[in-house]
Amino acid sequence: MNSLVATPPVPPHFYEYSRLASARQMSTPTVTPNSRKRKAEDDTADHDGRMSASPTSSPAFTPRTLPSARNVKRTRPNISGRPLSLPRLLETLDTDALRGMLRSMCERHPSLADEIVHTAPRPSVSSALQVLRQYQSNLQSSFPLGGNPASDYAYNRVRQPLGQLLDALSDFTPHFLPPNETQPSVSLSYLDDATEIIHALPRWSTPQNNIERDSAYDEICKAWILVIREAAKRGGGFQLQYGGWEQKLAKHNQNSGGKLQAAVHELASCLGWMHGPDTQAYGGSGGNNDLGSIREQLLSGTYGLGTPVKVGPW
């Protein structure tokens, strides 16, 4: 059954759009009869004309920078587990692990000990004192909490770290003595700090427990005497005269209870010999103090500043 479908009416705005489209089509320029396709001979003539004409300005030539060659690490075709190389392995070891490894290697191969001794850098005063102060810290931390720190019980508790500190002192002190150490200033600097460590050792109520402390004073006193004699031979005893060691050693002797008196006498005899026979003849402390003050004034450049200057005939 055929049915007629009525065409829906067109909205008014569609008519307006069609009028605008017609107007745009009418404003399109028309092609003139003179416009035609270019032929091959026209292109050739135009090319010859452009080639014959000299350009007004040459284009600037900009060099092209080539990309720099990168060091690309070649990738391994096959990835598999492998141990670390020696440099990387040493980077992972701390100080204690490295020391233990070297110690075990020297025990298994005694020939390596001499090579390590000659290859390792020479210990300095600061590095040696750092080790000694670490032993001193271990000793202080081993004391029991509360109670009498000078009792026999406390001595038994700290006996092991005390022995380690005294052994370290006995081992490090000869290293800084002549002839192994040729600089008197280095030897004196070490002895000054090492004596302070001995002053800090605990004093026990039982006299028998103080034998180790007294032995440490005897050893350090002998070391002082050896260094003083060697320093007196070098440079006219300059280190002993102007380093203030007379006052420092006197203070150490006072803190030790007179256990360094032999070193004080040795230093006084060396300084008296340097000052001449007049100083030894007087023998009093006033003469030494006067000479010391004159030396200090000469070194500081203030000698004679307070003395009035005569004006006129002499």
Curated annotation (Swiss-Prot):
GO BP terms in the entry: nuclear protein quality control by the ubiquitin-proteasome system; proteasome localization; protein transport
InterPro entries recorded: Cut8/Sts1_fam (IPR013868), Cut8/Sts1_sf (IPR038422)
GO cellular component: cytoplasm; nuclear membrane
Basic and acidic residues bias spans: 39-50
Location in or out of the cell: Cytoplasm; Nucleus
Function: Involved in ubiquitin-mediated protein degradation. Regulatory factor in the ubiquitin/proteasome pathway that controls the turnover of proteasome substrates. Targets proteasomes to the nucleus and facilitates the degradation of nuclear proteins.
Protein's name in the database: Tethering factor for nuclear proteasome sts1
Species the sequence originates in: Aspergillus terreus (strain NIH 2624 / FGSC A1156)
Lineage of the organism: Eukaryota, Fungi, Dikarya, Ascomycota, Pezizomycotina
